[in-house]
């Protein structure tokens, strides 16, 4: 999947000359026909002639909705490739948008081969990087790809945002969120690697990725990886504290590993620790988060939390839901009843797809950002109140009208 680039002149052939004339000269007709093609096919036909290339550009600009590719237990297998790599390779043929930014998450047990015995760290690292590279190669070269691996995955099956989301606490699974280039919205990946010799964060580092001096900043998804390493959790809190006092939505948690970040030139070190994420900027963005604390322990209290999120009145169209839960929640936490929180979300948000993970710590609080209205300003929330365990963070991100 590559960008529109080649061009030529439409030439006649043995087909009906009237059809040739229409498809060579009437842009309105060509555009109408091309709207039915997926992005990969559009990029191929863009090489037919200059007229078609310009029509392809216009058609792609109208495809602004976020798309997702998901792989759950039904797609899992014992084949050599992780199910997410296999499903992405198949489904990208039918995707209608040109991905500009991709966020993918996969289960750590199968993605990085944690079943390898001790003494085979080098083999495990190679397997992880090979899987990540295979996934990255499927996307356009100019696409920004951020990938993380976690103990468990929350995913909405493909086909419709109203499909029942699945909490997959154990097992091969994953998803890829595909963001097109959306007018008026900027999505930037960021990465801060913990360096024991230099723990200072320079202001320009934060400014370059949209985390400081950015009046349009609305949402930050932030993930600490390899936080079991000495000092890693403190470093995560240090990074978050630099922008947590702003009126933005902040959501995320601690994951096992960072597996992909194509915007960086140097290869990733699977043994390193640091902080990674995405910043979302643009006045059209609306967002809200709620915290499900330890008091939320049954269906009734979970639904009450979703009612608080629903009260934010975030539009459902072109909106994504995120669920960042502790590995200590889920099936066992709800007395052997599975999918409680995902089902509660679906009850109050019937058409919003939900994605996320079961991780090792959660970041966020109750907050709403819609235009100039802030439910709870960040400077009223202490840093300690943003970091949790045995909780779940539910978030909504609305990216404006898709029209």
Curated annotation (Swiss-Prot):
Q: Which residues carry this modification: N-acetylmethionine?
A: 1
Write down which residues bear the modification named Phosphoserine: 128
Does the record bear Calcium in its keywords?
A: no
Gene Ontology, cellular component aspect:
Z disc
**Name recorded for this polypeptide:** F-box only protein 22
The chain residues annotated with the modification N6-acetyllysine are 194
According to its UniProt entry, the function of this protein is described as: Substrate-recognition component of the SCF (SKP1-CUL1-F-box protein)-type E3 ubiquitin ligase complex. Promotes the proteasome-dependent degradation of key sarcomeric proteins, such as alpha-actinin (ACTN2) and filamin-C (FLNC), essential for maintenance of normal contractile function.
Species in which this protein is naturally found: Pongo abelii
Q: Which UniProt keywords apply?
A: Acetylation, Cytoplasm, Phosphoprotein, Ubl conjugation pathway
Subcellular location per UniProt equals:
Cytoplasm, Myofibril, Sarcomere, Z line
* F-box domain location: 19-71
Among its keywords, does the record have Ribonucleoprotein?
no
What GO biological process terms does the UniProt entry carry, in alphabetical order?
positive regulation of proteasomal ubiquitin-dependent protein catabolic process; protein polyubiquitination; regulation of skeletal muscle fiber development
Subunit: Directly interacts with SKP1 and CUL1.
Gene behind this protein: FBXO22
User: What Pfam families does its record include?
Assistant: F-box, FIST_C
């Amino acid at each position: 999947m590559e960008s529109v680039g080649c061009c030529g002149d439409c030439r006649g052939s043995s087909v009906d000359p009237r059809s040739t004339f229409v498809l060579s000269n009437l842009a309105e007709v060509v555009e109408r026909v091309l709207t039915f093609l997926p992005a990969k096919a559009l990029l191929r036909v863009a090489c037919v002639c200059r007229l078609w290339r310009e029509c392809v550009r216009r058609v792609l600009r109208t495809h602004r909705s976020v798309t997702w590719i998901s792989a759950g237990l039904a797609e899992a297998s014992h084949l050599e490739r992780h199910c997410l790599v296999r499903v992405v390779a198949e489904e990208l043929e039918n995707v209608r948008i040109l991905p500009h930014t991709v966020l993918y998450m996969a289960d750590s047990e199968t993605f990085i081969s944690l079943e390898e015995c001790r003494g085979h760290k080098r083999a495990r690292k190679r397997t992880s990087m090979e899987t990540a590279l295979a996934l990255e190669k499927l996307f356009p070269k100019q696409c920004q790809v951020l990938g993380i691996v976690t103990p468990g995955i929350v995913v909405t099956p493909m086909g419709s945002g109203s499909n029942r989301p699945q909490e997959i606490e154990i097992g091969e699974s994953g998803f890829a969120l595909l963001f097109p280039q959306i007018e008026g919205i900027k999505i930037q990946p960021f990465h801060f690697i913990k360096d024991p010799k230099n723990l200072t964060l320079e202001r320009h580092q934060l400014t370059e990725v949209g985390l400081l001096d950015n009046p349009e900043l609305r949402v930050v998804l932030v993930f600490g990886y390899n936080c079991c390493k000495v000092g890693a959790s403190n470093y995560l809190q240090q990074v978050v504290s630099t922008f947590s006092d702003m009126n933005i939505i902040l959501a995320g948690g601690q994951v096992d590993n960072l597996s992909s970040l194509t915007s960086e030139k140097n290869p990733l070190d699977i043994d390193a620790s640091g902080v990674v994420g995405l910043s979302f900027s643009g006045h059209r963005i609306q967002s809200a988060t709620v915290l499900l604390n330890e008091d939320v322990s049954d269906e009734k209290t979970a639904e009450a939390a979703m009612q608080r999120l629903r009260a934010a009145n975030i539009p459902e169209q072109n909106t994504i839901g995120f669920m960042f839960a502790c590995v200590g929640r889920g099936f066992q936490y709800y007395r052997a009843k599975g999918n409680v929180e995902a089902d509660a979300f679906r009850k109050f948000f019937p058409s919003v797809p939900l994605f996320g993970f079961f991780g090792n710590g959660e970041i966020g609080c109750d907050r709403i950002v819609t235009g100039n209205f802030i439910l709870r300003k960040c400077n009223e929330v202490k840093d300690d109140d943003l970091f949790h365990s045995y909780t779940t963070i539910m978030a909504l991100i609305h990216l404006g009208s898709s029209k």
